[in-house]
Amino acid sequence: MQYNRYMDFASKKCVPCQGGEDPLERQKVREYLKKLTSNWRAYDNYTKIKKEFKFSVFGQALEFVNEVGKLAEAEGHHPNIYLHSYNKVIIRLWTHKIGGLHENDFIMASKIDKIKPTE
């Protein structure tokens, strides 16, 4: 079995993107999306990914937002975060400096999926 270096995004650390790189191509985005464990979707012509999270109560949604914020600071890669309808959070990821998706976005998506609010 051949080892795929992209299989475990959550074990990786985001690396600073200085710009000047090309964004991931559509086929690579599709491949990377398959490696995530949940329902992340590409949009805006495969230049961004997003996912909506739903929680039982507002407090859980707010806790989740705060944990995503801590993760973003630790990784140096910051998603757009929208808390709406009291218990739903939309996370949108892309790398602003290259105007599209980078491996860092998938690393963040994988790590965000591991955040579980307390009951």
What are these regions, as identified by a protein language model?
Residues 2-119:
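Long, contiguous binding/interaction regions
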